[in-house]
């Protein structure tokens, strides 16, 4: 890891390494109480399933995501599992690992398997498990595009924080597995992540048969992630502080003093790999960078408008503080972008006008 004043980088060369690094940052597993009960093992071959599996980081399992191909565990995943030493959870019959889709069974660990024929069915199966663990289906659901991974990525962090499942649609409509999952929620709030170019209005009209539908998002992966980070339903009252409160949907982050997780938009598995950082510690939304060497204008403006803390005569020790996580090595997000974000998150003197 590489740290600056206000940022920490999980310096993985790929999402597999990033997932291992994040899991060990959230669960250092070096003292009593610092091991996870359960770890989720998600497939590298199915980014949709990996993003959907992020919801298992929410209560009650709080299971970080590790990644694997179908045949053998990658070395980074195998080593992380050994260090994490999950204890097992009675909520899943003592399982230490939740296997999602086509991943191997880790040797020597008790595992429960979630199966499904394709990404839509697998996401629905993950939703069923989360609902069973929680005692009831969630009141809200996130709908993401199965064909536009960069637009779906921010849903992973929110699922880990909120327990709201991520279900998928195509540009052509709502698959049967997704329809059945929505029916099980009993007319939930349905939040469609992405602009009409990604999920057409015709799909929203189909979704309206299953609940109250609202769209959140913007054109471009970076702007879309910013729109999701700032969103709240019901809307915040103009001129009053905005925050996520019980009964509302969305991060509603429009003030200093928060965490942020920066992801490369071309690495959708990083969204699942980093989801545990949104479901613990700083509880920050995932913001996307579409060029490793440049902080997108949408993210820059968002941080300038809302993130930079100011302090007055009380001094900096009375300020609120931010923290940014940067996911991936310098080929994913450059050191110059990390340094720029570090500066944007730094508390600065604020003029009192006197």
Kindly give the residue locations of the regions a language model identified.
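Extracellular glycan-binding segments that recognize GlcNAc-based cell-wall polysaccharides
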Residues: 1-354
């Amino acid at each position: 890891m590489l740290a600056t004043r206000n940022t920490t980088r999980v310096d993985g060369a790929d999402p597999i390494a990033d997932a291992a690094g994040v899991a060990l940052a959230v669960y250092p597993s070096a003292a009593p109480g610092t091991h996870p009960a359960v770890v989720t093992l998600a497939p590298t071959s199915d980014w949709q399933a990996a993003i959907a599996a992020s919801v298992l980081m929410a209560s009650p399992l709080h299971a970080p995501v590790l990644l694997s191909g179908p045949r053998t565990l990658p070395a980074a995943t195998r080593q992380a599992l050994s260090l994490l030493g999950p204890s097992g959870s009675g909520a899943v019959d003592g399982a230490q690992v939740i296997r999602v889709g086509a991943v191997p069974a880790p040797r020597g660990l008790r595992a429960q398997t979630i199966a499904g024929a394709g990404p839509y069915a697998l996401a629905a199966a993950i939703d069923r498990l989360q609902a069973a663990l929680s005692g009831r289906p969630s009141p809200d659901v996130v709908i993401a595009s199965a064909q536009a991974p960069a637009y779906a990525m921010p849903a992973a962090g929110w699922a880990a924080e909120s327990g709201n499942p991520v279900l998928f649609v195509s540009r052509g409509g709502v698959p049967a597995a997704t329809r059945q999952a929505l029916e099980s929620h009993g007319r939930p709030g349905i939040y469609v992540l992405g602009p009409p170019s990604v999920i057409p209005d015709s799909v929203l009209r189909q979704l309206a048969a299953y609940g109250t539908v609202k769209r959140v998002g913007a054109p471009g992966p970076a702007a879309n992630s910013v729109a999701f980070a700032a969103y709240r339903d019901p809307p915040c009252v103009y001129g009053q502080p905005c925050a996520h409160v019980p009964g509302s949907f969305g991060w509603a982050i429009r003030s200093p003093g928060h965490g942020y997780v920066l992801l490369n938009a071309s690495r959708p598995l990083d969204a699942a790999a980093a989801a545990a950082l949104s479901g613990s510690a700083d509880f920050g939304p995932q913001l996307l960078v579409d060029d490793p060497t440049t902080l997108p204008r949408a993210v820059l403006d968002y941080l300038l408008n809302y993130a930079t803390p100011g302090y007055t005569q009380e001094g900096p020790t009375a300020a609120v503080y931010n923290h940014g996580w940067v996911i991936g090595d310098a080929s994913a997000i450059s050191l110059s972008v990390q340094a720029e974000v570090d500066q944007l998150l730094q508390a600065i003197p604020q003029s009192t006008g006197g």
